Curated annotation (Swiss-Prot):
This is ATP synthase subunit a, chloroplastic. HAMAP family: ATP_synth_a_bact (MF_01393). It comes from Arabidopsis thaliana. PROSITE patterns: ATPASE_A (PS00449). The lineage of its organism: Eukaryota, Viridiplantae, Streptophyta, Embryophyta, Tracheophyta. Key component of the proton channel; it plays a direct role in the translocation of protons across the membrane.
Length: 249
């Protein structure tokens, strides 16, 4: 009986170990300090960050009293982000505008880069480049940052009294309220990842089948949905932060 039990345990452990090593597609890795780093995501993320930083430098390099076209555009983007933050968070939205704005702009430019930048031209030893948000590692990281942000917002506003929300309106709902905090980052990450991955797959399939006319409307639709996904993510992040500060559901 002991031998059978040990065999089953060994089989389960080895099976789980093999499953944990399963990968979808081919990936390009860097070895840094004994760790495997997903290089594809880092490369494309650095490109997106460089675009954002370069645009910001150009926008604030020589501000004018009478705004130019470029300055007008960036002021419009800032006002838009402030409006989203104020609507979802409330009067204490000010300190959270940089965080919400960073989320929105990074996701927006990442999504659009998948449709506009010719990532496939760059050859890698393994795998291929794609939008940063086309990788589950990126979307989960963004969702976890959002989780840390709304926990910090609630704790900084209410202290340890923040945790009283888990037993409101009745202690019976404690497991459900705890589960809710785990499902928030999951829903954020998988929604963004699924939509961007599906959009790129549809374009790739249509280009391979009908390479001239049909993919163009789908690409324009992809640009639209990419912007909507960035707005949804930023809006929900702001709503979660506002909810944690107000303590309502």
């Amino acid at each position: 009986m002991n031998v059978l039990s040990c065999s089953i345990n060994t089989l389960i452990k080895e099976g789980l170990y093999e499953i944990s090593g399963v990968e979808v597609g081919q990936h390009f890795y860097w070895q840094i300090g004994g760790f495997q780093v997903h290089a594809q995501v880092l490369i494309t993320s650095w490109v997106v960050i460089a675009i954002l930083l370069g645009s910001a430098v150009l926008a604030i390099r020589n501000p004018q009293t009478i705004p130019t076209d470029g300055q007008n555009f960036f002021e419009f983007v800032l006002e838009f982000i402030r409006d989203v933050s104020k609507t979802q968070i409330g009067e204490e939205y000010g300190p959270w505008v940089p965080f919400i704005g960073t989320l929105f702009l990074f996701i927006f430019v990442s999504n659009w880069s998948g449709a506009l930048l010719p990532w496939k031209i760059i050859q890698l030893p393994q795998g291929e480049l794609a939008a940063p948000t086309n990788d589950i590692n990126t979307t989960v990281a963004l969702a976890l940052l959002t989780s840390v942000a709304y926990f910090y917002a609630g704790l900084s506003k209410k202290g340890l009294g923040y945790f009283s929300k888990y037993i409101q309106p009745t202690p019976i709902l404690l497991p459900i309220n705890i589960l809710e905090d785990f499902t928030k980052p999951l829903s954020l990450s998988f929604r963004l990842f699924g939509n961007i991955l599906a959009d790129e797959l549809v374009v790739v399939v249509l280009v391979s089948l009908v390479p001239l006319v049909v993919p163009i409307p789908v690409m324009f639709l992809g640009l639209f949905t990419s912007g909507i996904q960035a707005l949804i993510f930023a809006t929900l992040a702001a709503a979660y932060i506002g909810e944690s500060m107000e303590g309502h559901h």
